[in-house]
């Protein structure tokens, strides 16, 4: 998976100890939540690497009496079908996977047929799908 790049200074109270990589299963979701519960305060929100992990985390938090989005916000990535069927409905990042596949296949065919020798860099715009797993946070960012 590719990393998500953002300016950490724009995130209020960003704490790098929550940067956990290569976790994508039930046990990983529990490990992340266990680590959060060791602290005095829960983070304002979680951005999960995919919707499946976000949904697992919502369920685990619910089992511990933490309610999404009232107590913590969660955002997933990939906009899978089930993300709009869970409670709360998951806010997610929709990536144009079908269009990426079509463009990749066309590029590969052109390369095989000798029509292209150049390396192509294609940028596609993801979209935020706002549902119910995020609450508004009113905070001031220090400069």
Short names for language-model regions:
Residues 1-143:
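Bacterial carbohydrate/catabolite-sensing allosteric modules
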């Amino acid at each position: 998976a590719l990393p998500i790049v953002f300016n950490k200074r724009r995130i209020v109270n960003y704490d790098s100890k929550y940067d956990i990589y290569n976790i994508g299963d039930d046990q990983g979701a529990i490990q992340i939540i266990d680590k959060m519960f060791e602290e005095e305060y829960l983070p304002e929100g979680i951005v999960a690497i995919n919707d499946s992990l976000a949904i697992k985390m919502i369920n685990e938090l619910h089992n511990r009496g933490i309610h999404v989005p009232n107590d913590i916000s969660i955002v997933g990535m990939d906009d899978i079908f089930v993300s709009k069927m869970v409670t709360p409905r998951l806010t997610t990042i929709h990536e144009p996977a079908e269009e990426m596949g079509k463009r990749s296949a066309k590029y590969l065919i052109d390369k095989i047929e000798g029509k292209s020798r150049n390396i192509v860099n294609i940028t596609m715009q993801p979209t935020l799908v706002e549902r119910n797993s995020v609450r508004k946070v009113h905070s001031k960012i220090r400069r």
